[in-house]
């Protein structure tokens, strides 16, 4: 068993942990073998110094080893944001997930209830009528029959109960805010991940490369959004063919108009559910455009579109044909029957 005191002592000097040390330390925390004080000390020590790629890789390795998995096709994708961007925006990645699923790409979405906003992925899906507290086997059925499934993080990461109270007491961002999107229970190898700070764009792409992902976009909007934004440029780190490339994109690259950040302000889960359903029913406007933009990037990651403009064309067809809305209705039905 890891000597947790020596781990804390090492971090206290400003030294970094090896990948194996991080794996062992997080195993101790998630197994209930570390006290709340020890966990708080380590989490804040890492936060103040800044977590390294090796430390995040080790922590994710433990998260993945302890999660309850879901069976999904090898070409399934996930669209997810870390949350915590403080924007209070509408549920962009959730809406984009249905657009992508309507294009025939299987989506295995991993998410939770809101952290800093009024409505996280789980909140808005529940408001839409999707049953979220179902077993991993039932989620697998949704993925296979509806082409989209939602994995509610607390169900799939039961070991997190050992660190939950400490996280609540700390009441500030820790490494765990980064780990969720990296710990998809379906083991997807293709992801579009939004992060709350530009500093994490490149490192998280490197972590996913370390862990064997095939195709990834990690993004952060210039307005602070943990999605691809309409209001300005978006920083991207792309993992493709084993190489990481960094670049910036704008709405114009996808043939979409810009819109101010406040045009995407959301409300509570019920209000956001109404707005999401309106997009899937064909309502034009900034919410539709940002959903198309993020769906387009995901279709590029999935290998379904060559570029953002083709992705937007496919996404537009998904919405206007009713295919995206049909995926939502099918998910509601299959999850209810679970």
Swiss-Prot record:
Q: Which InterPro entries match?
A: Anthranilate_Pribosyl_Tfrase (IPR005940), Glycosyl_Trfase_fam3 (IPR000312), Glycosyl_Trfase_fam3_N_dom (IPR017459), Glycosyl_Trfase_fam3_N_dom_sf (IPR036320), Nuc_phospho_transferase (IPR035902)
The record's keywords, sorted A to Z, are: Amino-acid biosynthesis, Aromatic amino acid biosynthesis, Glycosyltransferase, Magnesium, Metal-binding, Transferase, Tryptophan biosynthesis
Note describing how the cofactor binds: Binds 2 magnesium ions per monomer.
Instruction: Specify which residues bind 5-phospho-alpha-D-ribose 1-diphosphate according to the UniProt entry for this protein.
Output: 81, 84-85, 89, 91-94, 109-117, 121
Enzyme's top EC category: transferase
For binding Mg(2+) 1, which residues are annotated in this chain's numbering? 93, 227
The pathway entry for this protein reads as: Amino-acid biosynthesis; L-tryptophan biosynthesis; L-tryptophan from chorismate: step 2/5
What Gene Ontology cellular component terms go with this record? cytosol
Task: List cofactor names only.
Answer: Mg(2+)
- Per the record, what are the reactions this protein catalyses? N-(5-phospho-beta-D-ribosyl)anthranilate + diphosphate = 5-phospho-alpha-D-ribose 1-diphosphate + anthranilate
Residue sites binding Mg(2+) 2 per the record: 226-227
Q: What is its EC number?
A: 2.4.2.18
Q: Which domain of life is it from?
A: Bacteria
Q: What does this protein do?
A: Catalyzes the transfer of the phosphoribosyl group of 5-phosphorylribose-1-pyrophosphate (PRPP) to anthranilate to yield N-(5'-phosphoribosyl)-anthranilate (PRA).
Q: How does it assemble?
A: Homodimer.
User: What family classification does the UniProt entry report for this protein?
Assistant: Belongs to the anthranilate phosphoribosyltransferase family.
Task: Spell out the NCBIfam families in the cross-references.
Answer: trpD
Mind telling me what this protein is named? Anthranilate phosphoribosyltransferase
Its source organism is Rhodopseudomonas palustris (strain TIE-1)
Q: What is the gene called?
A: trpD
């Amino acid at each position: 068993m890891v000597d947790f005191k020596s781990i804390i002592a090492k971090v206290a000097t400003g030294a970094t942990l090896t990948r194996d040390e991080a794996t062992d330390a997080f195993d101790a925390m998630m197994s209930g073998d570390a006290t709340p004080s020890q966990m708080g000390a380590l989490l804040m020590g890492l936060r103040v110094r800044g977590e390294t790629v090796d430390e995040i890789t080790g922590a994710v390795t433990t998260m993945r080893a302890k999660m309850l998995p879901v069976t999904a096709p090898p070409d399934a994708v996930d669209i997810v944001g870390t949350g915590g961007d403080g924007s209070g925006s509408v549920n962009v990645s959730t809406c984009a997930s249905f657009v992508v699923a309507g294009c025939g790409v299987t989506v295995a979405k991993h998410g939770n209830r809101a952290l800093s906003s009024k409505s996280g992925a789980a909140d808005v899906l529940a408001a839409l009528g999707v049953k979220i507290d179902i077993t991993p086997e039932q989620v697998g059925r949704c993925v296979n029959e509806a082409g989209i499934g939602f994995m509610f993080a607390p169900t799939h990461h039961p070991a997190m109960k050992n660190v939950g109270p400490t996280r609540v007491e700390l009441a500030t961002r820790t490494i765990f805010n980064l780990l969720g999107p990296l710990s998809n229970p379906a083991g997807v190898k293709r992801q579009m991940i939004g992060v709350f700070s530009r500093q994490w764009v490149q490192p998280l792409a490197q972590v996913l490369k370390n862990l064997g992902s095939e195709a990834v976009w990690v993004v952060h909007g210039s307005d602070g959004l943990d999605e691809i934004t309409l209001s300005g440029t978006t920083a991207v780190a792309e993992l493709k063919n084993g190489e990481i490339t960094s670049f910036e994109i704008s709405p114009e690259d996808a043939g979409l108009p810009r819109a101010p950040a406040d045009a995407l302000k959301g409300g509570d889960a019920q209000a956001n559910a109404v707005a999401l359903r309106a997009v899937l029913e064909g309502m034009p406007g900034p919410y539709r455009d940002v959903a198309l933009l993020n769906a387009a990037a995901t279709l590029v990651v999935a290998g379904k579109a060559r570029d953002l403009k083709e992705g937007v064309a496919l996404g537009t067809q998904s919405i206007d044909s009713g295919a995206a809305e049909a995926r939502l209705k099918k998910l509601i039905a299959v999850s209810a029957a679970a």
